[in-house]
Amino acid sequence: RDTSVTGVQTCALPIWQDRSSMTKLIVFDKDGVILDLEATWLNSAIAMTHFVSELTDGRHKPKAFQAIIGIDEETRQIDANGLFAAGSSADQFREFVRLEPALEPLLLHDAEIRRQIRSIFLETRNATLEAVGSVPNGDVKTPLKSLYKAGYQLAILTNDSEDSARQSCDDIGILPYFNMIVGFDSGFGSKPGPKGLIAICDEFNITPNEAAMVGDTYADFGAAKAAGAGLFIGISNIYPDCPDALKAAAHLLPDLSGLPSLLAKHAT
């Protein structure tokens, strides 16, 4: 494997093989790739677990629900393989119900409870934004601008909502670079399902093997593989403690800064 591009880590025995002849479309995950996941959403997730604990009348403490989704309120650590980092809210709720079956009618079927949870997430996020703003995952504007000017089609595929993703990108001044944004609520399901990535390819009239997926979790890797993407590029600054799926990626970068040069080299 070629690891001469600055920032590319070597991972043993990759199972992903590049299948693209020419990359025309680059599809990005949002949280953990474009935005700093901890700074943007951790407070919201913590608040949500406290609310769910209250729904059990305190039978289960917030810490129990935090453990299920892979976060720690005290240390502010996030499990890169956990449901908070990689799953959707539906995935998280299903696991909460496994712990406490009495939550099923509330979390899975009660529209008012789900509305309250969305409000908690957004209100806590807005408080975070007022305090620190949307926090990019390093310098993302420079590489995205470079890729945009190079003629690539750019899109976002996230397990967050489409509106939230659009707002976050607008907050940090990168929204004009993206031709399409797809969230879990855009009608194509969530990752690791392939429908969102396939829909983006269809929108631009290209085949999946002409697309590259850039992500930081098993959900991103799984979506790329299931859709038949030609290239997957992992983003993680914690190698070798990165998500297990990323260790199977053909390319692994610490952030987006090295992406333009990697793709330029890949095209030659």
What do the PLM-derived regions correspond to, one by one?
Residues 1-15:
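Single conserved hydrophobic/aromatic residue that forms the stacking wall/gate
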Residues 23-138, 148, 166:
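N-terminal helical cap/lid subdomain that shapes the substrate entry/recognition surface
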Residues 130-134, 159, 188-189:
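Short, flexible loop segments at the rims of nucleotide/cofactor-binding pockets, characterized by
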Residues 14-26, 39, 54, 141, ...:
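Asp-based, Mg2+/Mn2+-dependent phosphohydrolase catalytic module
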